[in-house]
């Protein structure tokens, strides 16, 4: 090989030819050397007798390993002045024709290296993986857990934990937690496809895969795998140390005018992606039944019965609850996740919610939209504690924690916030007022629905009730009047003509600075809040009187024998 120490401007020879340097056309094909006049297709083949893999030690630049396509491993400890050669047939149960797919110097130990071999061109599909721990003097096979018939293409080692290895194979990715002594399939979510190359993005701890299907895959933040120790795996639950969560304002939309040839994947979810482990999780009734059915294989599978199936359908799902607390011990957020055996992930979007009201129905009257559902604010940068709990059959118990999470703003705002000391109290007051407004919204919608229903009920009564008829007329007039005061003119809305700002509009403006910004509240926010409170103060007595009259009319209809109203 050649090397350059001048930013690739000049290369210098670092060794003699490290291959067998054979004449390809003089080698036997199909049992004998062929005539030159026989058809050849060397255009479709790579050059033979070449170095196919080269690795420099991260610890000592003088240590290099080279592997060739004609079955040779070479290594040097003096920067290429002297090379030690070993043919692959000297490795345990390895044919001399094996191709060196990959060779890697260990990132943590100068005496350790790994090599992957491939002999499929000769009809041999065995996995050949070897490791040396004495500088290439002896190589041992490390294929425990790799099925026979699985070609191996690429190996990479974690730059932090020397025991953590990743292996790209013909049928996906494998992982070792003990430096190759055992391998485990690690391809959940991947298609069955040859993984021809692997790389680690060290800053983000991401594993990048390149496949023979012309695709790339990225495993975001695999760092929890470093802590997959026997001690941790023996615990009931573990929260793996999360990486620092970066706080910023997201840009909406992934792309605009890139056409149909855009080649990209979704970014990781914004916020903190938190990985946790659960040792044991209760199986659902359906899972238990299916497991028993699979065990019967070709035998008859009995019908479980309708009662059992109904119980399966009605069974409530168990879950984990990730609790986020600030350093004062106050709960900032709670996130639910799946309760299942093994490793799972949940996402926290770095916000805290101030609850206001929640509606079972999503329908809203004009002018009230957006006044319920809670207020969401960005959390302050700093350190938080994570706790993992499980909820099984309604009972909540602890699993793990606390584990610290740091939240950091990507950059400070250009403007200092003169109202920073009033920020929290302002939005707390806004949330309390929103609760009241949302409650009246719900009562108003419910009262309006009753009035419309009373109109139908009145037509079903056989007796004449003038009092109810006139009362319903007045109620309908009041309802229409209040809807105009709350939501504005229907006629203007039909044609898009501007109208007065409603309570909802004012509240929306008052909320305008809370998310995704941490600036404010501004003078405009506070003035909008004050106007909303004044508008509500004026209309509240009229609402109360309307609700009272709706109740009175309902009693009149009930006494007259009308149908029972089911709210």
Question: Where are each of the predicted segments found?
Answer:
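Single conserved hydrophobic/aromatic residue that forms the stacking wall/gate
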Residues: 1-11
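Surface-exposed loop and turn segments in beta-propeller and other repeat-based domains
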Residues: 15-45, 88-93, 146, 235, ...
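Conserved blade-ending motifs and adjacent loop-strand segments that build the rim/top face
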Residues: 22-35, 90-101, 143-156, 184-204
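Surface-exposed acidic, glycine/proline-enriched linker/cap segments
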Residues: 23-53, 110-112, 248-263, 302-306, ...
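A short loop-to-beta-strand structural motif that recurs across blades of beta-propeller domains
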Residues: 72-75, 82, 128-131, 138, ...
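Glycine-centered tight-turn motifs at strand-turn-strand junctions
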Residues: 96, 331-380, 401
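Contiguous beta-strand segments within globular domains
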Residues: 252-319, 345, 423, 427, ...
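Mature extracytoplasmic or organellar-lumen-exposed domains after removal of signal/transit peptides
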Residues: 387, 403-405, 436-567
């Amino acid at each position: 090989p050649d090397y350059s120490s001048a930013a690739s401007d000049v290369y210098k020879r670092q060794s003699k030819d490290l291959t067998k340097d054979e004449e390809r056309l003089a080698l036997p094909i199909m049992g004998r050397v062929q005539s030159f006049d026989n058809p050849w297709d060397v255009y479709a083949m790579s050059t033979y007798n070449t170095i196919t893999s080269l690795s420099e030690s991260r610890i000592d630049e003088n240590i290099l390993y080279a592997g060739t396509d004609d079955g040779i491993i070479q290594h040097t400890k003096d920067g290429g002045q002297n090379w030690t050669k070993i043919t692959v047939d000297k490795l345990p149960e390895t044919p001399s024709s094996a191709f060196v797919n990959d060779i890697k110097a260990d990132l943590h130990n100068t005496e350790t290296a790994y090599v992957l071999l491939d002999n499929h061109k000769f009809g041999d599909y065995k996995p050949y993986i070897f490791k040396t721990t004495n500088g290439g003097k002896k190589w041992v096979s490390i294929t425990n857990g790799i099925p026979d018939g699985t070609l191996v293409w690429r190996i990479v080692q974690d730059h932090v934990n020397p025991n953590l290895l990743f292996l790209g194979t013909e049928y996906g990715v494998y992982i070792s937690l003990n430096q190759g002594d055992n391998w485990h399939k690690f391809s959940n979510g991947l298609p069955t496809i040859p993984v021809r190359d692997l790389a680690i993005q060290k800053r983000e701890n991401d594993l990048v895969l390149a496949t023979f299907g012309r695709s790339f895959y990225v495993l975001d933040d695999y760092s929890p795998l470093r802590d997959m120790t026997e001690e941790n795996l023996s615990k009931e639950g573990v929260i793996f140390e999360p990486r620092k969560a970066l706080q910023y304002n997201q840009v909406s939309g992934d792309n605009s005018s890139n056409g149909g040839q855009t080649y990209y994947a979704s970014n990781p979810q914004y916020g903190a992606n938190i990985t946790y482990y659960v040792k044991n999780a209760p199986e659902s009734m359906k899972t238990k039944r299916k497991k028993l059915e699979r065990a019967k294989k070709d035998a008859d599978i009995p019908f479980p019965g309708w009662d059992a199936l109904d119980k399966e359908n009605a069974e409530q799902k168990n879950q984990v609850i990730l609790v986020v607390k600030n350093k004062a011990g106050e709960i900032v957020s709670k996130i639910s996740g799946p309760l299942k055996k093994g490793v799972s992930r949940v996402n926290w979007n770095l916000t805290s919610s101030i609850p206001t009201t929640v509606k079972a129905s999503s329908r809203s009257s004009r002018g009230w939209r957006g006044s319920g559902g809670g207020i969401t604010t960005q959390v302050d940068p700093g350190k938080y504690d994570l706790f993992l709990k499980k909820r099984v059959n309604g009972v909540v118990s602890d699993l793990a924690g606390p584990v610290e999470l740091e939240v950091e703003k990507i950059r400070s705002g250009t403007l200092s916030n003169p109202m920073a000391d009033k920020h929290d109290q302002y939005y707390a007051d806004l949330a309390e007022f929103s609760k009241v407004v949302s409650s009246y919204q719900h009562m108003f919608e419910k009262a309006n629905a009753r009035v419309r229903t009373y109109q139908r009920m009145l037509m079903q009564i056989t007796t004449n009730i003038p009092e109810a008829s006139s009362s319903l007329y007045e109620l309908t007039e009041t309802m229409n009047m209040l809807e105009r005061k709350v939501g504005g003119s229907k006629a203007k809305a039909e044609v898009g003509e501007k109208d007065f700002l409603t309570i909802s509009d004012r509240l929306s403006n008052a909320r305008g600075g809370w998310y995704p910004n941490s600036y404010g509240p501004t003078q405009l926010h506070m003035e909008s809040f004050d106007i909303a409170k004044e508008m509500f103060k004026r209309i509240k007595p009229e609402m109360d009187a309307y609700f009272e009259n709706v109740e009175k009319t309902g009693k009149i209809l009930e006494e007259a024998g009308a149908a029972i109203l089911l709210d």
